[in-house]
Structures are given as structure tokens and as C-alpha cells.
Amino acid sequence: MDEETIKKYKEAGKIAKKAIDYSKEIIREGESYLEVTKKIEEKIKSLKGDFAFPINLSVNSIAAHYTAKINDDSVFKKGDLLKVDLGAHVDGFLSDTAYTMEIGTNENKDLTAASKEALKAAIDTIKPGVQISKIGAVIEDVIKSKGFTPIANLSGHQLEQWDLHAGLSIPNFDNKSDTVLEEGMAVAIEPFATNGIGHVVDAEKSEIYQLIAPKPVRSPTARKILEWSATNRLELPFCKRWVSDNVKSFGIDMSMRQLIL
């Protein structure tokens, strides 16, 4: 990895850190998911970054990947356990970071501490040549030692330019893999601790999409969506709200359904 690449990764990381710090200032009981999301997006843009992926505000039993809808009227409530997951990119070089907070209470401090300690232990383990299974084992050991369970089917991942989930997945448990980290790799480590069974299931609907490959479509709106995503997001994730903001056309919902594989 050359110095210019490292510089851009670091800049993306600094932007994300400032956005995280800003989010902690504005998230309060009664605040709107949508307005908070828009404010964080504006912050990232003001720092000369762009979005690595839609900002995730995942509350309580929603483990990950919830992003505000077009007319989302959800508000934060006292006692909510909120996972804020965001990232920035500079010329396609990505950052991906997250934290967990409670709204107005502190009843889950041991759970959040378990994930924090697992992250620190994993970072201390990382070096060229280390097996990803060893990283997973460290995460698993720390989380279980605190009385919680790692989520097995959520994981960290390798980062490459314009590719958020590139190549390797970094497990949250010992998956016995012989695969090793190589010098020059960029990775996101994502420990998930739960007081549940340690397995998530997909929701029926999603607001987050990714262009896998262009496909022939008859709908003019669908063609506009393809053109916008290919030009502005390449292979990076995007959300329906961004499509609605940027593709001024009727039938966004129907056209999005036509594009799903």
C-alpha cells in the first residue's frame, strides 16, 4: 500500500471520527432518526468526504443495517439501545466505524463494554500473517468472558477502493480458517455482542441497495436509477432515500423492485 493510499484511508477515518463525535452531540430522546441522519450526512460533506454507505441507526433488537426511510417518523426513546454505524470515503478509499449508546439510561453498560473490549483485543492481535480465525477466537473469548454471546453471522471485512466488503470476512468467533491477513490489507473489525442466541435473521424489507451488475429494464425510472448508481456509487451501497433525492421521477418504489435480482 503506497503512501498516497494510506493518506486517503487515514483522511476517510478522520472524517468518520468527527462524524461519530458529532452524532453523540445531537442524538437525544425525542430526536428524529431522519433528521439526525441528514445532519450527520451534512457533517461528512462539510468535511469534504462522501458516504461509504448509508448511515445505520439500529435500535434494540435490530442488530445492524437500518437506515432512515424517505419519510421516516421514528424517534429515539428513553432506554433505546442504539448502534450508530457510519463511514466516509475519499476517492473511494473507505472508513467504517461504529459505536453503541443508550438513550437516557445505562442499563446495558456491560454489554457495550464487552464489544469495546473485544474490539481492543482484536486490534492488539492484528498483524501480517495472523489467521482470521485467531482474531475471531479473541473476540469470542472476550465476549463470552463477560457473559454474552458473539453474533456468528455478522462479521468484519476487508476494505478496498470502492469496495466495502472486499475479499475477506473477519469472524466474531473461531471459524477454524487458515486464511491470514496480508501486509497492506485494510480491514474493519466489527465485534457484535448480544444477550440473545448469537444469530440474526433478515428483515422482510430493506432500504439499502448495491449495484451488482447492470440489467436491461424497460422502465425509464429504473434506467435513471441504474445510471445514477453506476455514476455516483459504483459498487458502494446506497439507500432508497438517496435515490428519491437524486432521481426526480415517478415510480421509485416499483422501479427499485424491478432492479432487485
Name each model feature, range by range:
Residues M1-L261:
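Active-site neighborhoods and metal-handling regions in enzymes and metal-associated proteins
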